[in-house]
């Protein structure tokens, strides 16, 4: 469990104040949830990035707020891609004994037999909904695809649960499949198709049979 310090923001802040705050390398944030009132704080952006890389998206953080330390998770955050900057964070104070349902990424492991034979690995499901207490939420769920041949697939029911958590997705939902490669047409087939297009005479729209007879005369 990683720790992060925050500083309480006093009073109401204007857009100009928040802009200046971000320019100084700080991120405005709010803390709310279990056992705490809503508190406006600020955290160092670089330190926050270090912590989130350590604990991952669903990890628990010990957040210092004033004289207290609160166990929180990142409920949400906003990111400005143009400035490459985190602009706001929502910290959710949590009860460590209370289960939560969150999205956990699926990580494919190994190289499928079918892929070695030219098949294509398709992954329709990139995240699984997982219910667990905060300290039992996995960083990722590994799915071994080594034994998959072409036209083989794995569903949610095939995913091995190796921790104290429950997967909430429909058991029949497809996680990964290996499909046959798309066959490219041969040169002979391409030439044949081009020949068919050239032999087809375009039909003149609006030309009647009577017009055709006059033309023949």
From Swiss-Prot:
Q: Which GO terms describe its biological process?
A: translation
Q: Which UniProt keywords apply?
A: Ribonucleoprotein, Ribosomal protein, RNA-binding, rRNA-binding
What GO terms fall under cellular component here? cytosolic large ribosomal subunit
Please give the residue ranges the record annotates as the region Disordered: 178-217
Q: Which cysteines are joined by disulfide bonds?
A: none
Q: Where is the composition biased (Acidic residues)?
A: 184-205
- The answer to whether the entry has keyword Ribonucleoprotein is yes
**Which Pfam families did the record assign?**
Ribosomal_L25p (PF01386), Ribosomal_TL5_C (PF14693)
Read off the InterPro entries from this record: Rbsml_bL25/Gln-tRNA_synth_N (IPR020056), Ribosomal_bL25/Gln-tRNA_synth (IPR011035), Ribosomal_bL25_b-dom (IPR020057), Ribosomal_bL25_C (IPR037121), Ribosomal_bL25_long (IPR001021), Ribosomal_L25_dom (IPR029751), Ribosomal_uL5_bac-type (IPR020930)
Q: Does the keyword Acyltransferase apply?
A: no
Annotated function? This is one of the proteins that binds to the 5S RNA in the ribosome where it forms part of the central protuberance.
Family as reported in the entry's similarity comment: Belongs to the bacterial ribosomal protein bL25 family. CTC subfamily.
Entries under HAMAP family matching the protein:
Ribosomal_bL25_CTC (MF_01334)
Which protein, by its recorded name, is this? Large ribosomal subunit protein bL25
Organism equals Staphylococcus aureus (strain MRSA252)
Record lineage: Bacteria, Bacillati, Bacillota, Bacilli, Bacillales
What's the gene? rplY
């Amino acid at each position: 469990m990683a720790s992060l310090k925050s500083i309480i923001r006093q009073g109401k802040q204007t857009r100009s104040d928040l802009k200046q705050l971000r320019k100084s390398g700080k991120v405005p944030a709010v803390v709310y949830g279990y056992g705490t009132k809503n508190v406006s704080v600020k955290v160092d952006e670089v330190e926050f990035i270090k912590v989130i890389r350590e604990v991952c998206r669903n990890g628990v953080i010990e957040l210092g707020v004033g004289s207290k330390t609160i166990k929180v998770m990142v409920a949400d955050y906003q990111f400005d891609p143009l400035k490459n900057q985190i602009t706001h964070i929502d910290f959710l104070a949590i009860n460590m004994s209370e289960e939560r349902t969150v999205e956990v990424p699926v990580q494919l492991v190994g190289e499928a037999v079918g892929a070695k034979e030219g098949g294509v690995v398709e992954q329709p499901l990139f995240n699984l909904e997982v219910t667990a207490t905060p300290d039992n939420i996995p960083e990722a769920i590994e799915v071994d695809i080594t034994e998959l041949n072409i036209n083989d697939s794995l569903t949610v029911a095939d995913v091995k649960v190796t921790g104290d958590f429950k997967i909430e997705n429909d058991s029949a939902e497809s996680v990964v499949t290996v499909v046959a490669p798309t066959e490219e047409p041969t040169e002979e087939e391409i030439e044949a198709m081009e020949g068919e297009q050239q032999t087809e005479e375009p039909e003149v729209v609006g030309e009647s049979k009577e017009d055709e007879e006059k033309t023949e005369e």
